[in-house]
């Protein structure tokens, strides 16, 4: 991260904002017993609308299989996800949301939306769409 005489560079500012936003989101999710990682996995399962193989969940969460296994272990221990055999592939295990998992994901979504509203309140209305578009343009393809 390069800094010039006038202050932090673009990448430093972006990382700083990203870290602060992540901290606020984690703090909003913590009372629900969720982390950003848990919320992300639950959200991918909600979007799937059906049980999905752990390998697919790992892809959608952009993490390796061993990490998703540990994450699903924690979600299962919390009663938010259950594992089910894949009827089409006996070697594969699918992750499935429980009713509590759906409720907790919905509550997490509300908590995140509240943080987003608070953050966007700092940006003039006329600039909000532009900001979102600029942020989306920075996504790097893998």
Predicted regions and their residues:
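Pre-recognition alpha-helix immediately N-terminal to the DNA-recognition helix
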Residues: 13, 24, 40-44, 103, ...
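Charged, amphipathic alpha-helical coiled-coil/dimerization segments
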Residues: 22, 53, 73-133
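Residues in the helix-turn-helix
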Residues: 67
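N-terminal helix-turn-helix DNA-binding core of bacterial DNA-binding proteins
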Residues: 19, 23-64
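Active-site phosphate/pyrophosphate-handling residues
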Residues: 9, 40, 118
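C-terminal regulatory/oligomerization modules of transcriptional regulators
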Residues: 1-6, 125-142
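N-terminal leader segment of winged-helix/HTH proteins
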Residues: 1-32, 78, 137
């Amino acid at each position: 991260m390069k800094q010039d005489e006038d202050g932090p560079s673009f990448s430093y500012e972006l990382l700083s904002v990203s870290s602060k936003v992540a901290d606020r989101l984690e703090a909003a999710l913590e009372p629900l017993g969720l982390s950003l990682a848990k919320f992300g996995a639950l959200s991918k399962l909600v979007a799937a609308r059906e049980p999905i193989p752990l390998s697919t969940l790992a892809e959608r969460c952009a993490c390796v299989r061993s990490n998703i296994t540990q994450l699903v272990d924690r979600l299962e221990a919390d009663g938010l996800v259950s594992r089910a055999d894949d009827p089409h592939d006996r070697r594969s295990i699918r992750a499935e949301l429980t009713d509590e998992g759906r409720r907790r994901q919905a509550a997490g979504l509300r908590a995140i939306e509240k943080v987003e509203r608070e953050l966007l309140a700092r940006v003039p209305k006329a600039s909000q769409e532009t900001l979102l578009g600029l942020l989306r343009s920075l996504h790097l393809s893998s």
